[in-house]
């Protein structure tokens, strides 16, 4: 198979093992852990061209390229990573990883627990936070010999990690890109996460998280959780254009099977997701979202938290994103401007809702490329607080 000219092509994941204990915010300790990583491009001699990609809730290390010749689907952010793309692998060395607690090769609930005869951790895997993830990413940086990232980039939950980087390790990144994100979750967002969790926890096949030991799987719960989440990722306009009130069979069936196209879509998305994701991981990821709040240690003042930062910022929001509305990004921007920090902000008119950050929208791609490439048309110091 021939890959597109702007693709990174075939990529091979690498597993990094860390034998030192990892002390977590929850008070527990992982005796050792592993991180699954992919890299694209070439690290230059002085290691100054490295970009870290932080993934969202259902993301992982496979951000670009293909694993096999017959792969039909590229990495989750292939639209932005590759030769000549916004994150140009001809210029940058790009690092993507699967966070701990995940289910794509890094240490998580499906991994063997060395303190329990190497049985899967399951529900015994500790709850982890965005700060824990950033700590492990810093450890990975050390392993790679990268003292300072040229940029740390992330969308949604990934954007929260990028923001945490700027607070916890202000001397270790030059640029921070926060896309379709928020400084902390609203009560509404926490509520959506709780409904998703209860869908899983109430599934009879969940078995208190020990479904692997029971040779079972809470598939129905995970499908429902994904369906709820997916509704929040799309805008009303996107759903209207994609489905409207179209019927699958063209007429009412007067029953509870799938009738509307949007129902069929949600069930399909849930089904596909349930085949590739772990239920315990889903629970962990949603709690990490709920706990995120970099202002907590600064008197709950985001302005005070952002005063510690030293990098340049690009904050991007999308007009139809109601999961993390533009006003949430503006909170970050205002806190940075109050501190006279260099920040560029763009609210992009896009119809895809929260998922817009995954699409190669021309203005979005142009802005990201310009910010990373240092083009002068981004007048970061000229912004005024809204």
Swiss-Prot record:
Site (described: Important for acyl-CoA specificity): 323
Residue ranges occupied by any AB hydrolase-1 domain in the UniProt entry: 49-358
Entry annotated with the keyword Cytoplasm: yes
Organism domain of life: Bacteria
GO biological process annotation, one example: methionine biosynthetic process
Pathway terms, separated by semicolons: Amino-acid biosynthesis; L-methionine biosynthesis via de novo pathway; O-succinyl-L-homoserine from L-homoserine: step 1/1
Subcellular localization, as worded in the UniProt entry: Cytoplasm
Similarity comment text for this entry: Belongs to the AB hydrolase superfamily. MetX family.
Protein's recorded name: Homoserine O-succinyltransferase
Organism phylogeny: Bacteria, Pseudomonadati, Pseudomonadota, Gammaproteobacteria, Moraxellales
């Amino acid at each position: 198979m021939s890959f597109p000219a702007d693709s990174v092509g075939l990529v091979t994941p690498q597993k990094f093992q860390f034998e030192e204990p990892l002390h977590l915010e929850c008070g527990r300790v992982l005796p050792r852990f592993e991180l699954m990583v992919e890299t694209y491009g070439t690290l230059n001699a002085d290691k100054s061209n490295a970009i870290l990609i932080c993934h969202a809730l259902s993301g992982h290390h496979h951000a670009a390229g293909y694993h096999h010749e017959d792969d039909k689907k590229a990495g989750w952010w292939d639209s932005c990573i590759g030769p000549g793309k916004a994150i140009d692998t001809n210029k940058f060395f790009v690092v993507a990883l699967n966070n701990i607690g995940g289910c794509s090769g890094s240490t998580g609930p499906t991994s063997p627990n060395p303190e329990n005869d190497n049985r899967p951790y399951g529900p015994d895997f500790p709850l982890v936070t965005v700060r824990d993830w950033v700590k492990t990413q810093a450890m990975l940086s050390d392993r790679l010999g990268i003292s300072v990232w040229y940029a740390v980039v992330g969308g949604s939950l990934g954007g929260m990690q990028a923001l945490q980087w700027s607070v916890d390790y202000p001397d270790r990144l030059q640029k921070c890109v926060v896309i379709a994100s928020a400084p902390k979750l609203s009560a509404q967002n926490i509520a959506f996460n709780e409904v998703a969790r209860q869908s899983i926890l109430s599934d009879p096949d969940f078995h208190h998280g020990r479904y692997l030991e029971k040779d079972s799987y809470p598939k129905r719960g995970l499908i429902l959780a994904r369906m709820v989440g997916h509704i929040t990722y799309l805008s009303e306009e996107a759903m209207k254009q994609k489905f409207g009130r179209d019927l699958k069979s063209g007429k009412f069936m007067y029953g509870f099977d799938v009738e509307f196209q949007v129902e069929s879509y949600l069930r399909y998305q849930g089904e596909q997701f349930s085949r590739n994701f772990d239920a315990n991981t889903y629970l962990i990821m949603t709690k990490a979202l709920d706990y995120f709040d970099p202002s907590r240690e600064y008197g709950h003042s985001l302005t005070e938290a952002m005063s510690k930062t030293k990098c340049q910022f690009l904050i991007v929001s999308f007009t139809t994103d109601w999961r993390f509305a533009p006003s949430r990004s503006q909170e970050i921007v205002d806190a940075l401007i109050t501190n006279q920090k260099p920040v560029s902000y763009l609210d992009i008119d896009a119809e895809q809702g929260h998922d817009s950050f995954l699409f190669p929208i021309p203005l979005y791609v142009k802005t990201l490329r310009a910010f990373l490439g240092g083009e002068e048309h981004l007048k970061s110091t000229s912004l005024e607080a809204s």
